[in-house]
From Swiss-Prot:
Keyword Transmembrane: no
Protein's organism: Delftia acidovorans (strain DSM 14801 / SPH-1)
Name recorded for this polypeptide: Glycerol kinase
GO CC entries: cytosol
Role summary: Key enzyme in the regulation of glycerol uptake and metabolism. Catalyzes the phosphorylation of glycerol to yield sn-glycerol 3-phosphate.
Top enzyme category: transferase
EC number: 2.7.1.30
Length: 498
């Protein structure tokens, strides 16, 4: 038998999954990753803990599967994107905690860049908006604030990487300093047209080029693990940022195919093929996972509060004792009773980009119960995701394509049947849940399998993808449009609440 190992390094945990060549899970392991909050708005991880937990889960998954390194054809890596690590090349030790994608400390620098008129250039070259979310300004902060960092960087003594680069450095014993195009495209330093680090952007942010890793396609030779790491050498054959990896694991390989990941937030990506498409509707353009040197792009939108609204029902309102109870509570009423909730706890993301918005609950009457509020909270996840998909479809049609005809779903909240049915009703298209919902890790395994010859083509991978359940719309379009209009009215009211 042939097996593939996927390392899935996320924001809250490190996981490793062994897959067979049919994409079935053989064994898995997971460890929580400690979060560090030095100041309000700052979020850090200890890079040594990232490595320790990831290595431990890889070893545990292999042990659970009863496999040795020699049984693994190749290893794939998927990771939290944008999180920034800088380490000493000689010692392999980080010079500062990793600055996590959620961290906002670089916002003053971003404001300066916007005020200086650099937004159009950065979007044209990178597909991104100027935001502290991305790696470039985090890296600049480290160079400016860690004693001796800039001088050491200019001497070529330091290495920068997103989490994938850090893991590969550790896995290979410091022999490879590399990343893939999908991770590079989230730095605000990478030109997605040339697939190169952009000298002008590096100069703008005062970042020495010597810091930067080599950029490879997402299915490539990223090196081999040092024998002592996993008990033998394993080829590292696939790397992709978590959302691009999920798009790949969902077998969304051609223009117009889309997936939505329902986690703490929601992340929706629509493949645009080889076309770099700038959104007119508040979306980002990003590099999709690229198994070859051929360019591939996607439109991306992020919802800040998805499943987190269920955590709020549990911890804030104490309406439920555990998250699994929300569907039963919401189903105890036929609808939300006119209640509309906009969970703008941390502002609103795409396609609205209203950082100052605050959450609202409207439509309350004397007859409103906690069940109506729970249902409105669940429905808010679907409303926000529908706004993203409608924006994507407008962009697709404007560029001569067709609107999205099916949405593939994954992430923890996709197991909620009420939510998935309401999502299909709002969108007027089928919502499809796959047999394997671990699509992020599966995407990394598929990329590793392509580079190592386990799979010959993406067509072969498409044939492996299987649906577990298909949610078909049951609401007429007129009613769905009415509901979306009510949602947009509620969103407009969040500006008044700010």
């Amino acid at each position: 038998m042939t097996y593939l190992l996927a390392l899935d390094q996320g924001t809250s945990s490190s996981r490793s999954i062994v897959f067979d060549t049919q994409g079935r899970i053989v064994a898995s392991a997971q460890l929580e990753l400690p979060q560090i909050y030095p100041r309000p708005g700052w979020v850090e991880h200890d890079p040594r803990e990232i490595w320790r937990t990831q290595l431990a889960t890889a070893r545990e998954a292999l042990a659970k599967a009863g496999l040795a390194a020699a049984d693994i054809r190749a290893l794939g890596i998927t990771n939290q994107r944008e999180t920034t690590v800088v380490w000493n090349r000689a010692t392999g030790q980080p010079i500062h905690h990793a600055i996590v994608w959620q961290d906002r400390r670089a916002e003053p620098l971003c404001a300066q860049l916007r005020e200086a008129g650099h937004a159009d250039t950065i979007q044209r070259k990178t597909g991104l908006l100027i935001d502290a979310y991305f790696s470039g300004t985090k890296l600049r902060w480290i160079l400016d604030n860690v004693n001796g960092a800039r001088a050491a960087a200019e001497r070529g003594e330091l290495a920068f990487g997103t989490v994938d680069s850090w893991l590969i450095w550790q896995l290979t014993g410091g022999r490879r300093h590399v990343t893939d195009v999908s991770n590079a495209s989230r730095t605000m330093l990478f030109n997605v047209h040339t697939n190169q680090w952009d000298d002008d952007l590096l100069a703008l942010l005062e970042i020495p080029r010597a810091l930067m890793p080599e950029v490879l396609p997402s299915a490539a030779d990223f090196g081999r693990t040092a024998a002592e790491v996993l008990g033998g050498e394993i080829a590292i054959g696939g790397v992709a940022g978590d959302q691009q990896s999920a798009l790949f694991g969902q077998a969304c390989f051609s223009a117009g195919m889309a997936k939505n990941t329902y986690g703490t937030g929601c992340f929706m990506l629509m493949h645009t093929g080889g076309v770099f498409q700038t959104s007119a509707n508040g979306l980002l353009t990003t590099a999709a996972a690229q198994p070859t040197a051929a360019p591939a792009y996607a439109l991306e939108g992020s919802v800040f509060v998805g499943g987190a609204v269920v955590q709020w029902l549990r911890d804030g309102l104490r309406a439920i004792e555990h998250s699994g109870q929300v569907q039963q509570l919401a189903e105890s009423v036929p609808d939300s009773g006119g209640v509309m909730m906009v969970p703008a706890f941390t502002g609103l993301g795409a396609p609205y980009w209203k950082p100052d918005a605050r959450g609202t609950i409207t439509g309350l009457t004397r007859g409103t119960t906690i069940a109506h509020i729970a249902r409105a909270a669940l429905e808010s996840i679907a409303f926000q995701s529908a706004a993203l998909l409608l924006a994507m479809s407008r962009d697709a049609v404007a560029s001569g394509g067709a609107p999205v005809s099916e949405l593939r779903v994954d992430g923890g909240a996709c197991v909620n049947n009420l939510l998935m049915q309401f999502q299909a009703d709002l969108l007027g298209i089928p919502v499809v849940r796959p047999a394997c919902v671990e699509t992020t890790a599966l995407g990394a395994a598929y990329l590793a399998g392509l580079s190592s010859g386990v799979y010959q083509s993406t067509e072969e991978l498409s044939a492996l993808w299987k649906a577990e359940r298909r949610f078909v719309p049951t609401l007429d379009k007129h009613r769905a449009d009415e509901l979306m209009a009510r949602w947009e009215h509620a969103v407009a009211q969040t500006a008044l609440a700010a």
